[in-house]
A protein has these predicted regions:
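Short acidic active-site motifs
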Residues: 53, 75-80, 109
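Active-site charged/polar residues at nucleotide-handling catalytic sites that mediate phosphoryl
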Residues: 86
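Short, surface-exposed alpha-helical segments at coil->helix boundaries
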Residues: 2, 44-55
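Active-site phosphate/pyrophosphate- and oxyanion-stabilizing loops and adjacent acidic/basic residues
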Residues: 6, 55, 111
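Short, well-ordered secondary-structure micro-motifs
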Residues: 28-32, 80-81, 103-105
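Short loop/edge segments at beta-strand edges and connector loops
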Residues: 70-73
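Small/aliphatic-rich secondary-structure junction motif
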Residues: 1-40, 44, 60-63, 67, ...
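Glycine-rich, Arg-bearing micro-motifs that act as flexible, cationic patches
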Residues: 90-116, 130
């Protein structure tokens, strides 16, 4: 997806920013007091794991730090704000094929974003994980 985005940006004379959103488990979903006690540690660990994985990914693709953005929050909330703030013209997203039940329960992020981003949206189907 990064390679596709970078190639597209080059071909169109654009700049490619790489954005990843991560949303930790909301505290309101926790009803176990033992889990609540460790929630702050969970948040810290989750953020650390995402930062490490994102930094590794950015490093493998030689992306400048000012073009790499790790956002905490749900993509459908964070990406429209990012698009407006940075005046993005084209948002390129990856999508995976899910089963019908997953689609009903989780939905498609791209579908939720389609009407809320102020730019064109290109969805690239990613290869199925094996």
């Amino acid at each position: 997806l990064i390679d596709t985005s970078q190639a597209l940006a080059t071909a169109l004379g654009m700049h490619a920013d790489i954005v990843h959103c991560h949303a930790p488990l909301p505290r309101t979903l926790l009803n176990n007091t033992e889990l609540l006690a460790t929630y702050q540690q969970y948040l810290s660990d989750d953020a650390q794991q995402h930062h490490k994985a994102f930094d590794d990914l950015i490093g493998r693709h030689d992306i400048a730090p000012d073009a790499a953005h790790l956002l905490e929050g749900a993509p459908e909330n964070m990406l429209p704000r990012f698009v407006r703030k940075h005046e993005i013209d084209l948002l390129v997203m990856g999508a995976i094929a899910r089963g019908r039940l997953d689609t009903i329960l989780i939905g498609h992020t791209a579908e939720r974003l389609l009407e809320s981003v102020d730019c064109d949206l290109l969805v690239v189907k990613l290869p199925a994980e094996k």
